[in-house]
Amino acid sequence: MTNIRKTHPLLKIINSSFVDLPAPSSLSSWWNFGSLLAACLAVQILTGLFLAMHYTSDTATAFDSVAHICRDVNYGWTLRYLHANGASMFFICLYLHVGRGLYYGSYTYSETWNVGILLLFAVMATAFMGYVLPWGQMSFWGATVITNLLSAIPYIGTDLVQWIWGGFSVDKATLTRFFAFHFLLPFIVSALVMVHLLFLHETGSNNPTGIPSDPDMIPFHPYYTIKDILGFLIMLTALSALVLFSPDLLGDPDNYTPANPLNTPPHIKPEWYFLFAYAILRSIPNKLGGVLALVMSILILAIVPMLHISKQRSMMFRPLSQCLFWLLVAVLLTLTWIGGQPVEYPYVIIGQVASVLYFLIFLVFMPLVSAMENYLLKW
């Protein structure tokens, strides 16, 4: 008798995606982050759903409703901190996942890569709107500053900002629509994840060597399911430790002060996972230039496949490119640090140097070094 998982219309889709899927035998732990991201998304949707049952998206009650969740709802504090710190875990996994794609040349699967960039933008938008919902000082001023950036768009900028706000400032209408979109977007992200997987399974997985692995494939289950479960356990242990021991480690103390339009915090800054982009934005003295640099800091990933001129796909056997990659990581960490510092000497100049380096590595150094490696290998 044929196994039901191979004949049932629904089960055979799951079977071909997670059970009998042929996978390269050499995948390292860097390939765990896809499944970890799926786990993060599931945790975020579940905790978010339960939080939404108690949250009110009204400027008069939003802050108090979050306090009520933490104080009066059974395990409300756990839900709230799982959701807040789950977002941090989500972005850690996201950035490592993208870094893996850059290092091992996975971006040559252009459809999968482009859907991945769309996913990155969607998750960033979701996280930004979620940060506004507790209606603390940093929520309000973060929303004001970031939405105001759209006013740099010529001709339609000011109208666009007022249209997004639903008035002449960030107020009740803004909070209500941000809650609506924050609730909706994770489901759109889930749909995009399906498309991401669909494109991935069209080509099959890349592997650390970057060479075709057709002659050496193994079934996804049990080999990689067990590996993924270990990844889940490690991530959930880290998340639980963060939630139970220092839930406010990655948050901003200013967000425990209710939003006050008459009092600006001394340093307005976003959550830590946006600081690198915020530093790039601040390093350009022109408003429109800053906004373009901010968008390009992520969108530059879309042109990475076009700039790939190396004869080898992965960086595994390209030591010069490896040095550049780790320089890029160092630059990103520097930008993250600068984004959290006040706008004064020497932070401004460090941020500007790091921003220029960030774009130079992608646009100039990577192609140059690839060409040099090709020449050294006489290709």
UniProtKB/Swiss-Prot annotation:
Subunit structure, as described in the record: The cytochrome bc1 complex contains 11 subunits: 3 respiratory subunits (MT-CYB, CYC1 and UQCRFS1), 2 core proteins (UQCRC1 and UQCRC2) and 6 low-molecular weight proteins (UQCRH/QCR6, UQCRB/QCR7, UQCRQ/QCR8, UQCR10/QCR9, UQCR11/QCR10 and a cleavage product of UQCRFS1). This cytochrome bc1 complex then forms a dimer.
UniProt-annotated location(s): Mitochondrion inner membrane
Cofactor: heme b
Cofactor note: Binds 2 heme b groups non-covalently.
Bilayer-spanning residue ranges: 33-53, 77-98, 113-133, 178-198, 226-246, 288-308, 320-340, 347-367
UniProt binding sites for heme b b566: H97, H196
Keyword rRNA-binding set for record: no
GO CC annotations, alphabetized: mitochondrial inner membrane; respiratory chain complex III
Lineage: Eukaryota, Metazoa, Chordata, Craniata, Vertebrata
Annotated coiled-coil segments of the chain: none
MF terms (GO), sorted A to Z: metal ion binding; ubiquinol-cytochrome-c reductase activity
Keywords: Electron transport, Heme, Iron, Membrane, Metal-binding, Mitochondrion, Mitochondrion inner membrane, Respiratory chain, Transmembrane, Transmembrane helix, Transport, Ubiquinone
Protein name, as recorded: Cytochrome b
Topology relative to the membrane: Multi-pass membrane protein
Remarks, miscellaneous: Heme 1 (or BL or b562) is low-potential and absorbs at about 562 nm, and heme 2 (or BH or b566) is high-potential and absorbs at about 566 nm.
Binding annotation for heme b b562: H83, H182
Binding residue positions for a ubiquinone: H201
Location (main, coarse): mitochondrion
Organism: Brachyphylla nana pumila (Fruit eating bat)
GO BP annotations, alphabetical order: mitochondrial electron transport, ubiquinol to cytochrome c
Gene name of this polypeptide: MT-CYB
